[in-house]
Amino acid sequence: MEKDNGRQFTISQENWSLHRKGFQDQRRHQEKVRDAIKKNLPDLVSEENIVMSNGKDVIKIPIRSLDEYKIRYNYDKNQHVGQGKGDSKIGDIVARDPNGDKQAGAGKGSGAGDQAGEDYNEAEVSIVELEEMLFSELALPNLQKKEEQELVVEDIAFNDIRKKGLMGNVDKRRTILAAIKRNALNGKANIMPIYNDDLRFKTWTETIRPESKAVVIAMMDTSGSMGRFEKYMARSFFFWMTRFLRTKYETVEIEFIAHHTEAKVVSEEDFFSKGESGGTICSSAYRKALELIDEKYNPRAYNIYPFHFSDGDNLTSDNARCLKLVNQLMDRSNLFGYGEVNQYSRHSTLMSAYKNITDPRFMHYILKEKGDVYHALKFFFQKSAEEAPV
């Protein structure tokens, strides 16, 4: 401390890195949340509040694997020994919790327990964040270049510098360098003044590439045998499939077919909201898909992907027709995907007809629990080593 004309000055030094501590903690927490979301993707993909959302809101989801370190008392009140005899080996059991057998988990018990439950955190996550993590692992398989192609904008790249442009695109670094060079030529070692002639602006170019056209035909069983769980699983798969296709591909069309004993092309809203009843004749959906392809989607111009979800409970006499129509669809398609929601591993009349199909374009996946929606998406839309430009 120094005195100068009655005034006092204090010279101090502090660690300014501490001022960033809150920001660093926040960033570290966000990274932990992101890692926890990645680990929980199979459960999050089938969360009802996500599937039933409008796709735009920020939603709260439980994350049970996000552990926060904390100091607590030893509630067991056991006596602990801090030193052994010295003959212990790695892997030896040194103690057991006498109250361990008394602790009940989260299952169904015979009465009320007295042990603490498992805490979990609720994180706010946008649908966009989930999409970035999920869609990075997916791609349309067996994509081929077709005869007719459309030109679309792939990206906008700032890769040129000009003297004229928008002030929002001014390149500050190059502007200052231009001013320094001009002042240096005039014998001045200054940055200022900066004239209009020193301004440099970033400009962009549109990267354009040919993109193969594709159509995905979503077929869903809406018969009476499809219970609430089965319909929810099928709609969850098609919900994420639709968002994936519209996010990553600009020239992909999607057709929606709902069927029981009869099939009809429906709107996207009706496909995801309306339920029906009645018997099951799956061949009606395949016949309707073939009609769509023949009327609107020439296989020489389109990559075609039919996907059918059902509980496998089909009219037995219809299985032969289904097999024949599936082969006809595969002749026109890049891939045929069949998803069966079979929670209890019961006998499936439809799968019994499909199990002998050896064509590599036929892919099937059996979903037994909600987490299988994520695995089915990765199975049907797995990335190949070499993907055609799309």
Curated annotation (Swiss-Prot):
Q: Where is the composition biased (Polar residues)?
A: 7-16
Q: Which Pfam families match?
A: DUF444
Q: Where is this region: Disordered?
A: 1-31, 81-118
Q: Where is the composition biased (Basic and acidic residues)?
A: 22-31, 86-100
Q: Which InterPro entries match?
A: Spore_YhbH, UPF0229, vWFA_dom_sf
For this protein, the record's PANTHER family field holds: UPF0229 PROTEIN YEAH
Tell me which family the UniProt entry assigns to this protein.
Belongs to the UPF0229 family.
HAMAP family referenced in this protein's UniProt entry, alphabetically:
UPF0229 (MF_01232)
Task: Give the protein's recorded name.
Answer: UPF0229 protein ABC1477
